[in-house]
Regions:
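Extreme N-terminal starter segment of soluble prokaryotic enzymes
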Residues: 1-3
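Structural alpha-helical scaffold elements that stabilize or flank donor/cofactor-binding regions
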Residues: 77, 125-127
């Protein structure tokens, strides 16, 4: 089983959304895929027409971040996850090293996320 935790997923439109959907569909060729994504307008219609197992997380942004992290941790701890994929360092930062050590974890870095000065608060959060 594979896990995908993303802040960017259809029906929202964009390059990262297309990448995460394509990755998820490609992973289906190798086993079941569980996706944790943020709830957006028209997501229910998309999810019903998709062959992917998508769990949407709603609520205020600050609470949603912790709720999704807790759901991902619980899922990894209670399932045999072959690999987990995260679309952004913010999707992985609250998971915890102990949980991440239970599976192969991949975090996609995009945009301007890797050029923070060494020792800065953003640099420490990314690492």
């Amino acid at each position: 089983m594979f896990l995908v935790s993303t802040r960017n997923f259809p029906p929202e439109i964009g390059g990262m959304q297309n990448l995460m959907e394509g990755l998820s569909n490609a992973l289906l060729n190798h086993g079941p895929v569980k996706i944790f994504a943020e709830n957006i307008e028209h997501a229910e219609v998309y999810d019903q027409n998709s062959s992917l197992n998508i769990e949407r997380i709603s609520g205020f942004k600050i609470f949603r971040k912790y709720r999704k992290a807790n759901l991902v941790k619980e899922f990894i701890n209670s399932n045999e996850v072959r690999a987990s994929f995260f679309d952004h360092w913010k999707s992985i930062e609250k998971i915890g090293e102990e949980t991440l050590a239970k599976t192969k974890s991949f975090c996609l870095i995009h945009s301007k996320e890797i050029n923070h000065p060494v020792g800065s608060s953003l640099n420490k959060r990314v690492l």
